[in-house]
Amino acid sequence: ENKLNYYQPYKFQKSFHQAGSESNQRLLMAANRVGKSYVGAMEMAAHLTGLYPKWWTGKRYNQPIKAWVCGASNETTRDICQKELFGQPDNPRDKGKGSIPKHLIGETTRKPGVPNAHSSVMVKHKSGGWSRVAFKAYEMGAEKFMGESLDLIWLDEEPPQDIYSQCITRTLDRRGQVYLTFTPESGMTEVVQNFTSNLRPGQALITAGWEDAEHLT
């Protein structure tokens, strides 16, 4: 069954979505297993489809969007982000069991050399057009993050600073958004400090520990 229809966010997840109404850069910095990738996928699904829950007070796109979903490697992006959005990658019968309903999933392009991985997917937007989401991996290098103009980028797992900077640039033309979901495994990196030490207008930091995730308490 599709997850978007039944999404009841925890308080920290709702705060993260809500922050999108006034912040173009958001970081959900949270402990392992609290549902970071889940909330990231729910945010992406709502924007790709235009199907916003009744309680939604965050950013809204009233037209189809161009988006990227990015992770550390092609494999982790497939196993985490693609799975959360579209269902178990190695089981075709699972299509539509992620955050995006099956009947809204359109043309899918496979990623060469990575079994069961998507390169891009067309998603039907409620306005009638088609959104496009492409999958990227940090291991590809910053040069692979150049060129396109985008509405929305989700970075799941902490990116290198040069890739984060490229992603900000990619969204400037369209006044788009970049949001990050990760556990700070590498300490006080430049990316983390952007949000913890040097928070500027248009940025938001939401933190969560195990006590904030009701399924763990």
Place the predicted regions along the sequence by residue.
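Phosphate/NTP-binding elements of NTP-utilizing enzymes
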Residues: 1-217
